[in-house]
């Protein structure tokens, strides 16, 4: 699949994150020409690049353990959390979302969720990955980085104004190269 086919297929996607995320990200791997995620084994030491990587973490008040699943995890590279906004039916340009009230808040909560998952990863297996990717399926990728690999503060990457890669921006080879680097050799 080439980038134009990918964008054309996904720019008007709708439905649920759960119904679309894994297919979308698998096809993105094809476009990036990187390996696709492997089957999950349930063994954290072996699940280095998988969808739905299980983690046990403390909730926001630190009082209760919870079970969660990282949408896409690649050891030494990233934790990716995905959401999906509504499809634009109002005459906006293809690939643009309706101004869904609260979508930025949804994406910020996904970032907080990713940070909880990172804190819960077993550091005896590997240090925290350098990137968090927040994906609005069919619309955007927001990048955050923390290169000390201590799980500290993940900041917008490369900066606050340029952290978001829109679906149509993937036609720019520099954006494809950036995502490919995050996927394969981010350090």
Predicted segments with their positions:
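Charged, often low-complexity linker/regulatory segments
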Residues: 1-47
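Short, basic/polar, glycine-containing "phosphate-handling" surface segments that engage DNA
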Residues: 1-8, 15, 61-68, 77, ...
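N-terminal, well-ordered alpha-helical segments
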Residues: 22, 26, 53, 70, ...
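Active-site metal-binding core of divalent-cation-utilizing nuclease and nuclease-like domains
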Residues: 28, 38-76
